[in-house]
Amino acid sequence: MAAGGELSYEELLDHILNNKPIPNIVEVPNVTLDEGLASTPSLRPRPRPWEGQLQHQSHQGSLDKPNISLDIDQESLEGMTSLTRLSECYDIQSKLQINDSDNDNDDNNNDNNKGDGNDDDNNTVTANPTAR
């Protein structure tokens, strides 16, 4: 036996031919398990790269045509889509946009109006030096 517990090639052949146990090798019995003991896999097999692309394309095709049922009666649908109701919604939206733009202008004016507390902060006053 060589140093470090390793067998030379000739020693390994001698162990194999004479059916001697080989050091540092675990004997594993040749046992076949009963198929009835096998459990069912909980994970499905991973798709191969080319299969994944095919499934992705088929899912996109099915997503293009969703089957959605709406629980809306005809009267409420007509009420939501009537021209007067739509014009009211647009009117409210335009008023909100005007209010938002007014608030934005007020915010800008408030930022510019910061001063010493006088109301005349926006007015420009030039001081004339007095002669002595």
UniProtKB/Swiss-Prot annotation:
Pfam families: KPWE_dom. InterPro entries: KPWE_PEX14_dom. Residues 36-69, 97-132 are annotated as: Disordered. Keywords: Phosphoprotein. The modification Phosphoserine is found at residue 101. It comes from the Eukaryota. Copurifies with proteins HOL1, MMP1, PEX7 and PLB1. Present with 538 molecules/cell in log phase SD medium. This is Uncharacterized protein YJR012C. It comes from Saccharomyces cerevisiae (strain ATCC 204508 / S288c).
